[in-house]
């Protein structure tokens, strides 16, 4: 079996080429060690075809095969699909509780601000002014103080309501913006899918890759990381190299919300109410709205696709969107609780006011103390009746009784023990023996207890979110470290590999030098 005179040179050259390519891969790893989404690469080495060729139809069986060197079969991404999914799931959960904890902390600061302008302080001062009036029922300054404290109480609650409405509006806008971000990411994934499919189609089965879509897959992986911070995404790998992405972990609908199907992406928007028919929220391309509602709603896409879509945000259980949606729910709940509180307070104070007698009057008062109104968002605002004067305050339960303070005491009792739904007039002696008059017929809570209860509920929810945040952050850090141990670039490891291939290159160059020397000797032997 004869071989080429330059056979050894070709083998040595293959080693030089391989070492250069491997060094280029290492250089690229080092250069991108801090690039977001970059996955460490490694040169996969493969023995070159031997000489003579392996037996086949067109190649005779010959013995004594010689190796023809080495080649780089492909540049491989070092990644783990399991660790990637685990980390993205944990990132989604972590971002949810981080966002929710921030929102609940902000609500707590608004509602339970520890200052002289807090809700509790304003409520205590209001009923404290009635206590002062009960000791001097004929005092005009004491009566004016009651009106002033009532105005302060209303202004304090209005300030809190305004801040909560601002937060409500901001969270709604944030969720809408984040959905638009999700839409943009979905479009990017669909575009990258198309490019990856195109490259994979260029590669013939069983042959070295014409081109590896490593960079595109890195970009797509980074987009998935960004999406997982916004929502709890699920994705599957398709045979052509593309991925399909959805929100939720369900395998059927309802159960998830499709975002990307190979090269097709779906657009999500928000709606304030359920649509009356499918055509009002779904187009033939599958664009769907995501409504904030507790009841699921599904239907069939127009255009004959037959695909059912659930538009309920309850399936968005992770990511910043879930944290903001739950924060919005909590804000709405606090506003509803404040509406109930202020409505009950206004009703009871007005009931006491109109069942008593104004200063020097022989008939019960017809002037309400409070005239509740609503904001543009239909939340209750507590305002003192502009027609109310100091003389109009009904501090007495009887007419023409000098120093009668029983109605003022009734108002004080309201602060600590509540009042019935039906207006009842009590005198001082009856109040002494009845210390548990409820706010309404359905509850025994006092106004003080009612407000404290709201704040306590908020505190419990905030503490739970903070606890979940700590747990989720710890799991996220752990999964991120595991993922980085596989996909991240270790500079020390790269430096060691660089020296290894440098030595290999030197050895190959030395081998070529020896072969060259042998050839020179042979040539010099020719006469």
What positions do the PLM features span?
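Structural signature of extracellular appendage/secretion-system components
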Residues: 1-527
